[in-house]
């Protein structure tokens, strides 16, 4: 008996929708990263994209525990000397709902061409509406 290896043409990518209202950021991000990679499937193969599409709604209502809303800091750099900018979780959520979730999930995925393909299957929306009703996503409870 030989080891099974999934072929890219044989993989079926399903669509799921997650309501992030009052969910904890890290717990949602780890479950989403697992499903984007396809590790929840029996046909998981490390070098093939076996994951599903994930649509996250109400990302603006995500929460973090403790005082992390003020203490958790996201950094970015412009490339110029002294060009570092720091933003805390609360301000980032107010300006760009869902950006913190995208950054958390991206950090949990592999770095490289396969990881970049996986992150493209994540769709995050701050409100309750999303344009993916034609794909008939199934509700996923976390």
UniProtKB/Swiss-Prot annotation:
Superkingdom of origin: Bacteria
Ribosomal protein as UniProt keyword: yes
GO BP annotation list: negative regulation of translation; translation
Family matches, as CDD domains: Ribosomal_L13 (cd00392)
Record-level Gene Ontology MF annotations: mRNA binding; structural constituent of ribosome
Key words, A-Z: Ribonucleoprotein, Ribosomal protein
GO (cellular component) term, any one: cytosolic large ribosomal subunit
SUPFAM superfamilies xref list: Ribosomal protein L13
InterPro entries named among the record's database cross-references: Ribosomal_uL13, Ribosomal_uL13_bac-type, Ribosomal_uL13_sf
UniProt keyword Ribonucleoprotein present: yes
Family annotation (Gene3D superfamilies): Ribosomal protein L13
The protein's assembly and partners: Part of the 50S ribosomal subunit.
Family classification: Belongs to the universal ribosomal protein uL13 family.
Free-text function comment from the UniProt entry: This protein is one of the early assembly proteins of the 50S ribosomal subunit, although it is not seen to bind rRNA by itself. It is important during the early stages of 50S assembly.
Protein name: Large ribosomal subunit protein uL13
Species lineage: Bacteria, Pseudomonadati, Pseudomonadota, Betaproteobacteria, Burkholderiales
